[in-house]
Amino acid sequence: MNPIDTDDLEKHTPMMRQYLTMKAEHHDMLLFYRMGDFYELFYDDAKRASELLGISLTARGKSGGDPIPMAGIPYHAVEGYLAKLVQIGQSVAICEQIGDPATSKGPVERKVVRIVTPGTLTDEALLQERQDNLLAAVYQGKVGFGYATLDVSSGRFVIAELETKESLEAELQRTNPVEILYSEDFDAMELLHHFKGKRRRPEWEFDYDTSIKLLLAQFGTKDLHGFGITDARLSLQAAGCLMQYVKDTQRTALPHINAITRFNQTDTIVLDAATRRNLELTQNLSGGRDNTLAAVLDNTATAMGSRMLQRWIHQPLRDHAQIFARQTAVNELLETTAHESLHEQLKALGDIERIMARLALRTARPRDFARLRQALNLLPQLQQSLAQLSAPHTVKLGQLLGEFPEEQQLLERAIVDNPPMLIRDGGVIREGYNAELDEWRGLSEGATDYLVQLEAREKERTGIATLKVGYNRVHGYYIEVSRLQSQQVPLNYQRRQTLKNMERYITPELKEYEEKVLSSQGKALALEKQLWDELFDLILPKLHELQAFARAAAELDVLSNFAERAETLGYTCPELSSEIGVKIEAGRHPVVERVSQTPFIANPVTLHNQRRMLIVTGPNMGGKSTYMRQVALITLMAHIGCFVSADRAIIGPIDRIFTRIGASDDLASGRSTFMVEMTETANILHNATAQSLVLMDEIGRGTSTYDGLSLAWSAAEYLAQQIGAMTLFATHYFELTQLPELMAGVYNVHLDAIEHEDTIAFMHAVQEGAASKSYGLQVASLAGVPARVIKAAKHKLHQLESRDHQVEGVNVNGTRAPIQTLLALPEPVENPAVSKLKAINPDNLTPKQALDLLYELKRLS
């Protein structure tokens, strides 16, 4: 959005001058300007809002001689419109009337009281319940990047020092922020192109000294040594920018942001961006959540548990001790069936994590307090359930849950059973909590009895049987008489309102009572709001302990969920080994087995020091990619403490999981399919180690046969002999099945199929040894390729096979050609011009000789 020109404000009306001044301060976001019961937008904001929200674009008179484009939304519907805007990455400044229209001379005083951006949301109605809502900042140094994320809705603050663009891309994929701040000199914009909420920030917001001061002030510490982050210079600069941005948008204290942690890649199995994408961990290739690992594993009782599970999936642990602690807890929950009762108890807790953030920001609503009260009421019952368990990790979590009897009793006394949505209309504070409030309410609530008595008395006094006493918000209390009987009213009746068939009156007595009641209502509401504000002060001293309660409850939820998933889906506890290797018996793809219409065929895999690479061959559609992915997913599941989809699994140390599976053009970066494939392959060859699990699928298919085969052969050879990584290498180049004859530790496996006449049945079973053919024409027929095309293809295949030469390494008789023959390309012949140039000594040439030589080289080339 273009900045607003405020140089010539005098030509505008006073109200538009006020609007333009505020808009100039928030030029990069939509300004919702409160006017009565509507939020209005003007000029470019109105046009943009009309386009984004589908609301009418009109005009509001003129200002400065020009019509003013205008659009508006009702104030009571604002949350729905805000939700739409933040989902597309749009930020909004909300400007409210804070002055009294009755006493204002000129425009009513207004102020921006709230700024809503995608990454700073805390309102329950605007947040995705089961997804973290991360605000991120990235700062580029001379070498490497600083990266910081903050979840304002929970207070979780994390930084990471990243050496390369590839590691930054992986972090962006892992964290998936909804809003990103980046410095002016950031030059890797191709990594951010698909993020909707991008904000360019001035360089000074990333200043190191300023960042340190901001963080120290936020945490209330003298230094950052206690957080173990003093050497993370670049990410601290990013964190400082984040902190300033959140302070600017929230405009209040942020006590729930009380710590910062550093994400160390050495603590977790490294997953690059391609691997996270290809394995469809929490997001499928279409951008949704269906048919992902998270969708299968997530039956958590709480939203905060669901969010923690997704973080675990993206951060598989390397430390076997931590994994074993989780496994032991899950195993005990499963054996004792305690997960069943825990699930029901946890379900009633609600999203305490986000409730505590709203409490800290003082934006909590009455129902947040009611949910917190319910959670604290359930806590003793939860503690009692955990007291029956002895797994060390479960015991530790039980201790972290804490005890809050005073806060529970306070909320029980203070908040009604079913509070309204908002505090503004009262009715939140329970009767008996405050004597003065009860007194004012008594005056107000006694009005009904008084009016009934007054009506009866006046009917008797005046003899008017149709006389009624009533009330409305506009005219207050009144005595209503039909027009025909209005001649009978006493002299002390003062006409207040004339209707078609009725006259309404007020008496001095009724007027006095009205003032008394309205005064008591106003005083009751003011006192109730004061007591409401005091509740925050009484609860917030326990903020940190309540946050720890939320984290412990979320982790209990994940562990209980793992136990339930193991029982329901038939998972087993994997064994952790100190020896390098992966051994899986009857492994199943955890996602495919859930969506498959037919029984899933379980398959084994064995990788160890003497069997480091499997060359996987078989027909297209035979299940090679599914087989490889299931090995990676089972390995990952084992490292988050989850039981796995196999009869048995023994997993050794893993430092990284790489996948090179499938490819498509990267249009945003201008990279072809083959370029994407080679970039991912290069990343694997540069970074894989002997403890890495590598999945390579169809390397080289994006180029010519000889180029592709050469690259696939060389990549496999390098992985097997130079790196020694545990590798599954699927290929359609049958020549690669000769690798086991040439290299130690390389073995062939294949997925079987049975051919009958022109049909094919995929067995999906992994067998030792190489496949015999790929069944390409049969698969094409199954895919619906017209019969005429299939017939022509068979004819062409027969012609090619009949020629006296080898096609893709296959002899005329159908046997494989020696790979040495296939790769024995003719030595290149050097160009005569190059030979001539190499023989020249330029120091011995005269200018005339140099010119003659130039013409000679031109002729030779």
UniProtKB/Swiss-Prot annotation:
ATP binds at G618, P619, N620, M621, G622, G623, K624, S625. InterPro entries: DNA_mismatch_repair_MutS (IPR005748), DNA_mismatch_repair_MutS-lik_N (IPR007695), DNA_mismatch_repair_MutS/MSH (IPR017261), DNA_mismatch_repair_MutS_C (IPR000432), DNA_mismatch_repair_MutS_clamp (IPR007861), DNA_mismatch_repair_MutS_core (IPR007696), DNA_mismatch_repair_MutS_N (IPR016151), DNA_mismatch_repair_MutS_sf (IPR036187). CDD domains: ABC_MutS1. SUPFAM superfamilies: DNA repair protein MutS, domain I, DNA repair protein MutS, domain II, DNA repair protein MutS, domain III, P-loop containing nucleoside triphosphate hydrolases. It comes from the Bacteria. PROSITE patterns: DNA_MISMATCH_REPAIR_2. One of its GO terms (biological process) is mismatch repair. GO terms for molecular function: ATP binding; ATP-dependent DNA damage sensor activity; damaged DNA binding; mismatched DNA binding. Pfam families: MutS_I, MutS_II, MutS_III, MutS_IV, MutS_V. Keywords: ATP-binding, DNA damage, DNA repair, DNA-binding, Nucleotide-binding. GO terms for cellular component: cytosol. HAMAP family: MutS. Belongs to the DNA mismatch repair MutS family. This protein is involved in the repair of mismatches in DNA. It is possible that it carries out the mismatch recognition step. This protein has a weak ATPase activity. This is DNA mismatch repair protein MutS. It comes from Shewanella sp. (strain MR-7). The gene is mutS.
